[in-house]
Amino acid sequence: MSSPNIWSTGSSVYSTPVFSQKMTVWILLLLSLYPGFTSQKSDDDYEDYASNKTWVLTPKVPEGDVTVILNNLLEGYDNKLRPDIGVKPTLIHTDMYVNSIGPVNAINMEYTIDIFFAQTWYDRRLKFNSTIKVLRLNSNMVGKIWIPDTFFRNSKKADAHWITTPNRMLRIWNDGRVLYTLRLTIDAECQLQLHNFPMDEHSCPLEFSSYGYPREEIVYQWKRSSVEVGDTRSWRLYQFSFVGLRNTTEVVKTTSGDYVVMSVYFDLSRRMGYFTIQTYIPCTLIVVLSWVSFWINKDAVPARTSLGITTVLTMTTLSTIARKSLPKVSYVTAMDLFVSVCFIFVFSALVEYGTLHYFVSNRKPSKDKDKKKKNPAPTIDIRPRSATIQMNNATHLQERDEEYGYECLDGKDCASFFCCFEDCRTGAWRHGRIHIRIAKMDSYARIFFPTAFCLFNLVYWVSYLYL
């Protein structure tokens, strides 16, 4: 009887555990040497950490509940019908935030405004029961519910902002209240009354109403008594300064019905600095320059003529430039009046010299001066030291500074613009007339022109600035 092989049995019994342990060691060693294993694990750990961090920073919102709420609200909802149709008018509370105004284009009579426009109304179809009080939604939801058909009545062009996404916001409360806001840039019409230009003030309106719903369907109301404005220092008004604003509500009657019209009036006052430098000061200096002609010798024909023509042409250029910043209105503005009067003064200075030169150049020597030397004739002294009447009825002026006369009134020698000796000075038909010496026209002009221009400026500025 052979004895049992204990070692072989023991070897078969213990060989399996030992082999398994060895294989486990080798597998762990190979896995530790594999480079992607640890990195994959670290990435997974990082993703878990980021995911946990997101959940920590963001409040837990039951997204499934919001989706269910929206689906329930939109189920059977008809966005073509206004709230409470056939029951009562829909009340729209409006509000506005003025981000900026400007520039104002006087030629096209329009201005640019950037606003945030808000509308609030109640829609009972959008009520929901949930612990969520308000649904904060983006612009994708706007087209799925009813929105008021508000339009700006005096807008020439309006642009909504789309960068980086449409600048529109929608809020729905659980009681059915809806808030809809958007940002707009509008080129609105403003009828400028330029009678007092450039000392004018304007109230530029921004009007809006419903496009298709009359007062029986939609009623607009201001949410607040006044409109809020941003920092006016960043506004591009340039020639204007912002004075204030006011908002009103009115009803406009049309053939299609009565519409509630909401208006905001922006009060603007023009700044005169630009036009003072560009127009008023140059025109005044040109007028003063034309007076230099009165101190130049009357025999200096080229100098005085060149000065007069130059000032007239300069005034013509200034008047043309001043009109470029204005629309082609048919009435006279304050600047037109000032430029026109300045042109009249400059042109009158040129005409004054033309008149003076004409009469001075047409002087003639006394015809009887040589005759008196050759054939002395007896005379009767009627006016000592002023005039003598000769037998041949020729009248002469004998003054210390005049040896010439002017032909006037039946061939008699004339020494003044309005008066001729002797019939002129002593005649009853000339009684009370002003006696003006043509030779002294420059002296008269030196006083008359500055005085008249100063009086005009006094009346002009007082009338337009204080009356």
Curated annotation (Swiss-Prot):
Named from the GO MF annotations, one term is: chloride channel activity
Q: Which CDD domains match?
A: LGIC_ECD_GABAAR_G (cd19000), LGIC_TM_GABAAR_gamma (cd19054)
Reactions catalysed, as given in the entry: chloride(in) = chloride(out)
- Which UniProt keyword terms apply here? Cell membrane, Cell projection, Chloride, Chloride channel, Cytoplasmic vesicle, Disulfide bond, Glycoprotein, Ion channel, Ion transport, Lipoprotein, Membrane, Palmitate, Postsynaptic cell membrane, Signal, Synapse, Transmembrane, Transmembrane helix, Transport
Taxonomically, the superkingdom here is: Eukaryota
Q: Using the chain's own numbering, where are the disulfide bonds?
A: C190-C204
Matching PROSITE patterns, A to Z?
A: NEUROTR_ION_CHANNEL (PS00236)
**Primary location class:** membrane
Q: Which GO terms describe its biological process?
A: cellular response to histamine; chloride transmembrane transport; gamma-aminobutyric acid signaling pathway; inhibitory synapse assembly
Q: How is it modified after translation?
A: Palmitoylated by ZDHHC3/GODZ; required for the accumulation of GABA(A) receptors at the postsynaptic membrane of inhibitory GABAergic synapses. Glycosylated.
InterPro entries assigned:
GABAA/Glycine_rcpt, GABBAg2_rcpt, GABRG-1/4, Neur_chan_lig-bd, Neur_chan_lig-bd_sf, Neur_channel, Neuro-gated_channel_TM_sf, Neuro_actylchol_rec
- Tell me which parts of the chain lie in the Extracellular compartment: 40-275, 323-334, 465-467
Membrane topology according to the record: Multi-pass membrane protein
Disulfide bond is among the record's keywords: yes
Membrane-traversing stretches: 276-296, 303-322, 335-359, 444-464
Q: How is the subunit organization of this protein annotated in UniProt? A: Heteropentamer, formed by a combination of alpha (GABRA1-6), beta (GABRB1-3), gamma (GABRG1-3), delta (GABRD), epsilon (GABRE), rho (GABRR1-3), pi (GABRP) and theta (GABRQ) chains, each subunit exhibiting distinct physiological and pharmacological properties. Interacts with GABARAP. Interacts with KIF21B. Identified in a complex of 720 kDa composed of LHFPL4, NLGN2, GABRA1, GABRB2, GABRG2 and GABRB3. Interacts with LHFPL4. Interacts with SHISA7; interaction leads to the regulation of GABA(A) receptor trafficking, channel deactivation kinetics and pharmacology.
Domain notes, please? Answer: The extracellular domain contributes to synaptic contact formation.
User: Which PANTHER family does this chain map to?
Assistant: NEUROTRANSMITTER GATED ION CHANNEL
Give the protein family.
Belongs to the ligand-gated ion channel (TC 1.A.9) family. Gamma-aminobutyric acid receptor (TC 1.A.9.5) subfamily. GABRG2 sub-subfamily.
Name of the protein described by the UniProt record: Gamma-aminobutyric acid receptor subunit gamma-2
